Curated annotation (Swiss-Prot):
Belongs to the class-II aminoacyl-tRNA synthetase family. Residues 243-534 are annotated as: Catalytic. It comes from Haemophilus influenzae (strain PittEE). It is found in: Cytoplasm. Binds 1 zinc ion per subunit. This is Threonine--tRNA ligase. It is an enzyme of class 6 (ligase). Zn(2+) binds at C334, H385, H511. The lineage of its organism: Bacteria, Pseudomonadati, Pseudomonadota, Gammaproteobacteria, Pasteurellales. It catalyses: tRNA(Thr) + L-threonine + ATP = L-threonyl-tRNA(Thr) + AMP + diphosphate + H(+). The keyword Cell division does not apply. Its cofactor is Zn(2+). One of its GO terms (cellular component) is cytosol.
Amino acid sequence: MPIITLPDGSQRQFDHPVSVLEVAQDIGAGLAKATIAGRVNGERRDACDVIEQDATLEIITAKDEDGLEIIRHSCAHLLGHAIKQLFPDVKMAIGPTIENGFYYDVDLDRSLTQEDIDAIEKRMLELAKTNYDVVKKRVTWQEARDTFEKRGEPYKMAILDENIERTATPALYHHLEYIDMCRGPHVPNMRFCQHFKLQKVAGAYWRGDSKNKMLQRIYGTAWADKKQLAEYLTRLEEAAKRDHRKIGKALDLYHMQEEAPGMVFWHNDGWTIFRELETFVRTKLKQYDYQEVKGPFMMDRVLWEKTGHWQNYADLMFTTQSENREYAIKPMNCPGHVQIFNQGLKSYRDLPIRMAEFGSCHRNEPSGSLHGLMRVRGFTQDDAHIFCTEDQIESEVTSCIKMVYDIYSTFGFTNIAVKLSTRPENRIGSDEMWDRAEAGLAAALAHNGLEYEIQEGEGAFYGPKIEFALRDCLGREWQCGTVQLDFALPGRLDATYVAEDNSRKTPVMIHRAILGSIERFIGIITEEYAGFFPAWLAPTQAVVMNITDSQSDYVQQVVKTLSDAGLRVKADLRNEKVGFKIREHTLRRVPYMLVCGDKEIAEGKVAVRTRKGADLGTFTVEEFAEILKNQVRSRELKLLNEE
């Protein structure tokens, strides 16, 4: 007679083994109708699964994150059901969930078109609206293999042969005539799977191996109700408008090409933004008492073996050879900074030493993962390493946290998710060292009153880290900043200082990045601002234009005055109507447009408009120069009189 303990601590006793759904029915009809699955003793189980012994139970509904993930997984099966009806010869591979949705890899002898995708989606909805029950059956390994051999599913047979023990009892989920194999759980009825959208088709190698056959991957999104789906699709439309790749091309910021995959060709305007970010961070480095250094681009393999990178990071490192020596192009800056620290004797009185670098790094990321500025192979880190004593850890980490929030707020990012990533399976250093490192970061977070999420096993191989993820205007998270403790690397590279008792001790090293990759950060703010950069970051801060040729000399004088004031200003003297010029520069997102007609010349002024169409009236050139200089100096996010 199992006793079921519910989340509120109440208990229900049954005189026979009972399913998750039966417990929900015992609680109430409304809950039973909403039940998707259950969490039995912390493990997700299907609604039909039977509980035979005392257990804790949490009912999962569509309102739960787990429930939504199960809906998405079942929509992948629904996709399989529909495509199998429309294309009986298709071979089904895998259909997992991903963030916000799902996909299914299929093997079909022709390429799927948009018309095909529309037809599959239509059939999915028709099937879901029949509200059929999903039936789960446990079978032997051989029964599962016989089932898929009979159905002509070689990929399912390969999964059984290569990934599932012969003694296992796989779960087969029956969707009417369609059968799929999965760990589950899945929805008990397809009434839960009626709010979805198929999005695109892409190529994907079986098992992710380029030596295997290329399959077609059908992506979709699924939600608990119509409103959630509509809101998500609206966010996608807005994200597409803000895509940094499109905006980057429209504003002539940068380009990338096949001959240098994952490497950025910065154009003048994009490089202007890049340098402004560097200048801004440099002001903060001075404020927080950092020294700036520059390490070499590549170093001998021997050094990377000492650090552990060669053993733990080799797949992501570019290497080269010269004069019978093997070198690695640096994927990170920390080993070089330790070499700088090691030059000359250091005393405890010298610590902390805060060493910063805009370090050019390269990582051999898989080509399929590259994505505009967001995922590149060559990037610049606003990197720093702090060498300190154990007693200084909390104060130094606290200073890093303050600096992170200080910098992010300048860009308008105030919604920041904080995560503490702990020891991974593949790591260097002792458990005792990791205990101290993780406790040190947790103490600093507690001292600063920050709530945080623990990410088990997500730390780097040499230390735990705090991650700062920015939430943008579309609710997306971008992981940028990190503060990472490292008790291992300084010792591996023989870094020491003279302690107060004249003994030699190894310093603690704190890895710190705020923007992370500057390239990626530019991609993030391009999408956050939709290309409408604040005046201090805008490549061109103002354009001065004439109405007729008679104002050309005056325009040139205005441009010179503003340029001499340190502002980025251009003249537009083309023989075009002023309305045409304004429209063009508005599309280029230039913050201010200054129009000079005969009236403005007579008054010694300029007529000022913003890129959002606001007419600000007329100003003397000196007045406008002072206004814009103040906006740049204070790094304001809004333009003059902008809501």
